[in-house]
Amino acid sequence: MALAKQHDIVVLEDAAHAFGGEYKHRKLGTIGDFGSFSFHEVKNITSFGEGGILCSNVTEFLPEMRRARFLGTDFSKHIPNWLYDVTAIRGKNGPFVATNFSTTEIQGLGLQLQIARIDQIIEARRRASEYLTKRLSACDALIPQDLGNDEIKPTFHLYQLQIIPEKAGGDIQLFKKKMDAKGVTQIPHFGPLYKFEILREYGYDEKAIAESCPVCEEVFNHRFTHFPVYGLTPEQLDYMADAILESVDEMQRGV
């Protein structure tokens, strides 16, 4: 943040998967000028479908943020008989019409109840991740999930596993095929942004960007994958750990 302020840069903190996490004793999503959380159905806690929260440390934007939530309506003023006014939101490039980002009361209630359980939910995820890390740490061809420390408290949205191709006898693509054959779900969807078709349509040169990002290419194409762990039984976690170790063993033996 100090570097951003030095260069007058606004920091937008994407904390979509990180509700309840901490960095240096500060809650994730509250460090930047703006922070956003997602409560889509695949996140750690949900609002029964879509939903999110936008936070800000920039007080002058708060009135605009509140009005942007629902058609530019100022709910601090009395609205008789639902005869509300649609006002413009003042943006950098001029006024624009707000859309409807409001949610239902049922969704709001469901989210509130889950927020009250966030520590319990994260702890369950942490225990599952801790078990896998303990099982997998004995294999020198694997880099298990980092479990954090006193200054870094993850939310364990997914279990991130990296392999070392030189030691594993193959890269992550071969590993994924073996895990698929064993019926273990993987979620490797965090791809480099420059690989999205929309950026090609905007005229970005995917090949040129890829050549300038060799580490990103190596990690995505050859080294990492993710596993869902929340709600798995001890027997299912056992099976997952066994499948991972067996797959690496097969790769090393060339079978």
Predicted regions and their residues:
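Catalytic PLP-binding core of fold-type I/II PLP enzymes
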Residues: 1-25, 57
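Proline-centered loop/turn at the N-terminus of a beta-strand
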Residues: 8-10, 27, 34, 185
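Generic structural signal for small/hydrophobic residues in well-ordered secondary structure
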Residues: 14, 35, 39, 52, ...
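Active-site region of PLP-dependent enzymes
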Residues: 18-24, 31-158, 194
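Short amphipathic alpha-helices in soluble, non-transmembrane regions
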Residues: 65, 171-182, 240-245
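Conserved PLP cofactor-binding pocket of PLP-dependent enzymes
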Residues: 71-86, 131-136, 175-215, 219-225, ...
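Conserved PLP-binding active-site segment of the aspartate aminotransferase-like
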Residues: 148-149, 157-168, 186, 195-202, ...
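Generic C-terminal helix-cap and adjacent flexible tail
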Residues: 246-255
